[in-house]
């Protein structure tokens, strides 16, 4: 009886790879339940969702909306004027300082990341900066040195993998960080692009195309489908496409980009039918790839799909009972809110708390 009592009193340990919404929420929940928690993050707490994706992109969209509101203020009877040297009123133009905009966006993202880190520290979570990978079914090895030669090893009762995903890169359209860009590289631009070509009309492509159009850039959106936002409600997508065209955006439907090349100070996108579209910059928004390669998942017995996503059930558990996964690296819906719920659910389930399994039909999403 004494031995049994002691086994129940032993503090459970949880190791988490990835500090995005899923890993962050898993760490907080595990700490609140009294577990010994270690979180490994290579880029900063909050992951890409906070640092390069959701927070900066939605802040950019809000900035673009503000620019439109100012431009259309006269329609509401609000008029902005400046006086010339002669005393006559001059109607000012809306000017976008993209360098200042991007500096603010990244500052907001970093502030939120720092706040999240502070909350984890306050909760007693041990944080390790580095690249983590599984070492067997209960271990995590972290490369902490700049050259990947220094290592730290963690043993834990429960492992949570929340490594996220990265922008998909096509062989014939390799991003260079200057003219051919992924959505994580947009915030390095110092000036508004003269003509932004967006390849991919899913949620990411449509949101950025709309934002840069509202900021004043010429935008061409290349969609391989019949209309923008494939997979969403067709009537709603049709309305959004009309709004895009009314705002001056060029939408090329049923057009597939074969390659993207630099051309002097611009880019040329070659379509599958031989047409060429020239612009100043190109944003590649053709999906994402889970960051699951080379981190020891298959060696630990974790089942992956052909696309590299981690197969999880409705409580975020993988094919290995004590290994869980959350976020964009899993087969569930790639939303920050879902990742957060998966992270909490994973540790609740692992540590014996009550959970209500996720239901896809009850997941709501929003497009900005």
Q: Where are the regions that the model predicts?
A:
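Glycine-rich dinucleotide-binding loop and its adjacent helix/turn
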Residues: 54, 161-218, 222, 298-300, ...
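N-terminal Rossmann-like FAD-binding beta1-loop-alpha1 element of flavoenzymes
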Residues: 13-38, 206-213
């Amino acid at each position: 009886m004494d031995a049994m009592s002691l086994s129940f009193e032993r503090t459970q340990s949880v190791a988490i790879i990835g500090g995005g919404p899923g890993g962050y929420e898993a760490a907080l929940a595990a700490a609140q339940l009294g577990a010994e928690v270690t979180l490994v993050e290579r880029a900063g707490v909050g992951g890409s969702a906070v640092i390069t994706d959701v927070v900066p992109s939605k802040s950019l969209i809000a900035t673009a909306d503000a620019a439109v509101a100012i431009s259309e203020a006269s329609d509401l009877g609000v008029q902005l004027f400046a006086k010339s040297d002669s005393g006559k009123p001059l109607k000012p133009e809306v000017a976008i300082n993209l360098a200042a905009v991007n500096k603010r966006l990244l500052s907001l993202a970093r502030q939120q990341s720092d706040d999240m880190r502070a909350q984890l520290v306050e909760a007693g979570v041990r944080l390790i900066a580095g690249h983590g990978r599984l070492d067997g079914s209960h271990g995590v090895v972290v490369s902490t040195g700049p050259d990947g030669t220094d290592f730290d090893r963690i043993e834990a009762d429960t492992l949570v993998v929340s490594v996220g995903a990265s922008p998909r890169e096509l062989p014939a359209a390799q991003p260079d960080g200057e003219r051919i860009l992924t959505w994580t590289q947009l915030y390095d631009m110092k000036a508004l692009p003269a003509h932004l070509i967006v390849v991919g009309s899913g949620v990411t492509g449509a949101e950025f195309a709309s934002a840069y159009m509202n900021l004043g850039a010429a935008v061409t959106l290349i969609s391989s489908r019949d209309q923008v936002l494939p997979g969403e409600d067709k009537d709603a997508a049709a309305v959004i496409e009309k709004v895009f065209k009314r705002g001056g955006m060029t939408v090329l439907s049923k057009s597939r980009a074969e390659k993207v090349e630099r051309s002097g100070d611009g880019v040329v996108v070659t379509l599958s039918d031989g047409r060429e579209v020239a612009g100043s910059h190109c944003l590649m928004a053709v999906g994402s790839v889970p960051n699951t390669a080379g981190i020891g998942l298959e060696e630990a017995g974790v089942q992956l799909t052909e696309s590299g996503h981690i197969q999880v059930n409705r409580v975020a558990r993988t094919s290995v009972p004590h290994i869980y996964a959350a976020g964009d690296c899993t087969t569930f819906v790639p939303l920050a809110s879902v990742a957060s719920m998966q992270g909490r659910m994973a540790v609740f389930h692992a540590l014996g708390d009550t959970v209500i399994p996720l239901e896809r039909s009850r997941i709501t999403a929003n497009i900005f």
